[in-house]
Amino acid sequence: MPDSLLSPLHSYHIKNKAKFIDFAGWSMPFSYDGTIKEHSYVRTDSGFFDVSHMGRIEIQNSEIDNLSKLICSDIKNLDEGKALYSIFTNSDGCAIDDVIFWKFSDHIVLICNAANSSKVIDHLKEHLISINEITQSTALIAVQGPNSLNLMSNFLQIPDEFSCVKNDIYTYARTGYTGEDGLEIMVSLDNLDNLIDFLTSSEAKPCGLGARDTLRLEASLPLYGFELSQNITPIEAGLKWTVTNKNAFLGSDVINEQINTGNHQILKKFTIDSKSIARTGTNVKAGNTPGVVTSGNYSPILKKSIGFALFENQPTTDLLEFDIRGKLVEGKIIKKRFLS
């Protein structure tokens, strides 16, 4: 078995007694002080995550027309200095990956999921899009939480929400994956120490991928491989708002048919008021409509179990019945985000 890839911050993680997990071929910190504590750091103050395992690709703006044929969102009319969340779709309209684009005057930075990095690169090359893969030559740090911008204003210019900035050292955006405000910062390995020294001397706490997952779930954000996959379209995942590309793109015929007919599987958010947790793969029914849990966990903030479930078609009731280890547990579909 090949050795795991190591983050450029691996020695920092060891020094700070991180517990590691193998994620998409990378050895990454799962937690330091514990997932619940780290979850609380980000919800109440600030925390920072090493997300250097995520793929980072530069694409020249001359490729935008070709790139537009592969994603469901309108990147052609994206302003310089803005970020865009979008989804690469296949010919069936399903998700190859969900990604973030940062657009600058002459190029775009594409950030993709670690597990899909090779797949996205191959997909771009297959469609003759020239790229510059920069994952190994950079690090990516996410600083998140209600106090994160106040903290980082002592170090960087703070852009508007969903905007991106590039200076001589840092390329960053006011984006994130926690439901809190914050920055995602890309930096060359030569300049990484300055950023980490600032963060470690500040009030921000290091956080691992365990808290990142509970935070994203609590914020009603999808995770590729669970709420999105090569068998789930953006429409089925409740991400119709991302479909802003008015031109033809790969799988757009399928997606438009789903929008017009409503005939498709559908993802729903749910809560369970008891202590029972409906985890990934748990069977669930909404009346006679069967479904399966894609993600489920306990919410430290809401003090209840929450999750996503994928149903074969639109449920006719919000009342749910889960089969949790042979025991029937009641829950309900909710229409709003878990956290407002």
Regions found by a protein language model. Give the residues of each.
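Conserved, structured C-terminal
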Residues: M1-A24, M28-F30, I36, F101-S340
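Well-ordered mid-protein domain cores that form the structural environment of catalytic cofactors
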Residues: K69, D74-H127
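Acidic, proline/glycine-enriched N-terminal capping motif
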Residues: M1-T89, C94, G210
